[in-house]
Amino acid sequence: TGLKTHCKICLVVRKDKDGIRRYLHMGTGNYNDSTARFYTDIGMFTCREEYGVDASSLFNVLTGYSTPPEYNKFIVAPHGMRPFFEAMIIQETENAKLGLPAKITAKVNSLVDPEIISLLYDASNAGVKIDLIVRGICCLVPGVHEFSENIRVISIVGQLLEHSRI
């Protein structure tokens, strides 16, 4: 399929007295029993139908069994992620223009996409407070008067992979 996959999902499908039930765990880190003694990654365990259906659909796409569907809850690259992020940035920009609270906090591996960067600059100029945590390369220039003054970037460039952990 030519896709780069970086997802932490475990899906158990079980037939019980009420029919098919899907149990799903999604997390930020690897399923590694030796490191589990030292820290806990952030995860979600659910049997809510809409998440289970999305997980089943995702596995079907990754194995080549089907084409990407319209997901109920999942935001999946490469098709769903860009429109989702664009819509969220535009929504916060509109909130700021209406005098409503407007803030963006995002943690990303890198920020090099010109269109997303342009939307973030527009949001900053509208008054949106933006905090970005960028692990790798960042092409956005923060803190420039009357251009990106509402944007703050924290860089966590380094040789160690970093996850949210408790």
Segment roles from a protein language model:
Residues 1-22, 27, 35, 50, ...:
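PLD/PLD-like phosphodiesterase catalytic module centered on the HKD motif
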Residues 14-15, 29-31, 60-67:
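Non-catalytic alpha-helical coupling and interface elements of nucleotide-dependent molecular machines
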Residues 38-45, 69-77:
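Charged, low-complexity surface segments at secondary-structure and domain boundaries
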Residues 44-46, 65, 144:
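Alpha-helix boundary/interfacial micro-motifs
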Residues 65-74, 99-101:
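Gly-rich Lys/Arg/Thr-decorated short loops/hinges at beta-loop-alpha junctions or inter-strand turns
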